[in-house]
Amino acid sequence: MKKARFTETQILRVLKEVEGGRHVKDVCRENGGSEASYYNWKSKYGGMESSDIKRMKEREEENRRLKQMYASLSLDHEILKDVVAKKL
């Protein structure tokens, strides 16, 4: 998976600069991002603090790992069911 280009702190700084009255286009150009990224960040992170964003990203990563674990265990379970069924 591709690593995020912007940290939580950078995203929050961009959001706060625009909230402070600067133009989206100017802030995005200065920070190397796109206007589309800004609007995605605004809808996802608007009103959050840096610690909230970090906690949310940690939970998203944990959720991804748990889903992978669940898929692996489900596959193991199906294989074991087939083995038991063949032995009976």
From Swiss-Prot:
Keywords: Plasmid. GO terms for molecular function: DNA binding; transposase activity. The keyword Magnesium does not apply. The keyword Iron does not apply. InterPro entries: Homeodomain-like_sf (IPR009057), Transposase_8 (IPR002514), Transposase_8_domain (IPR052546). Disulfide bonds: none annotated. GO terms for biological process: DNA transposition. It comes from the Bacteria. PANTHER family: LOW CALCIUM RESPONSE LOCUS PROTEIN S (PTHR33609:SF5). This is Low calcium response locus protein S. It comes from Yersinia pestis.
